[in-house]
Regions:
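Extended substrate/RNA-proximal surfaces in nucleic-acid metabolism proteins
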Residues: 1-83
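Charged catalytic cores and adjacent phosphate/nucleic-acid-binding surfaces used
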Residues: 57-161
Length: 161
């Protein structure tokens, strides 16, 4: 469970992957690609959720880890593009961690690939419904997006924001 507590995440990292964050993330992306290839759905959400607890590792070794991570992530984006799937920009963690899933650092590449996006707060608390939305739209605009994909009358449409 990539959304589990750090303790559970760290335990799985050590027990299942011998402490190798790279192996854990490789497996996560392998399964993600398999899901995108074999399932029929419109939206992929939480694409980089694996980094939620991994950020504590990235913070110390960012320069060493990021090149291989970004390469793997780009391979997943290529599959998303080929399959024509919408990517969710999820703001649920914005208040707590000042980040989204997918992370803002990926938006330019997603735009360059022509991957459509939708924005969602994934909110479980009505008081936090709008948390991070304006920041997400701002980041999208900064990275070249002018539209988001919205479901209207049972059909997906690109809507300017």
């Amino acid at each position: 469970n990539v959304g589990a507590s750090f303790e559970i995440y760290n335990s799985a990292l050590n027990e299942l992957y011998g402490g190798s964050l790279k192996k854990m993330i490789e497996r996560y992306f392998e399964l993600t690609v398999e899901m995108i290839e074999n399932c029929q759905f419109d939206i992929v959400g939480h694409l980089d959720k694996i980094t939620d607890n991994a950020e504590c590792f990235f913070s110390e070794e960012m320069d060493n880890l990021m090149p291989w991570y970004l390469s793997m992530f780009d391979e997943v984006l290529q599959v998303v593009k080929r399959k024509g799937v919408i990517l969710e920009v999820n703001t649920k963690k914005f208040l707590k961690k000042k980040r989204t899933f997918v992370h803002f650092r990926h938006l330019k590449r997603m735009k360059d690939l022509g991957i459509p996006v939708m924005v969602n707060s994934d909110c479980h608390n009505p008081m936090l419904m709008e948390e991070g939305l304006s920041e997400a739209y701002f980041a999208l605009k900064e990275n070249g997006y002018r539209t988001v994909r919205v479901l209207r009358d049972g059909k997906w449409s690109d809507v300017e924001f």
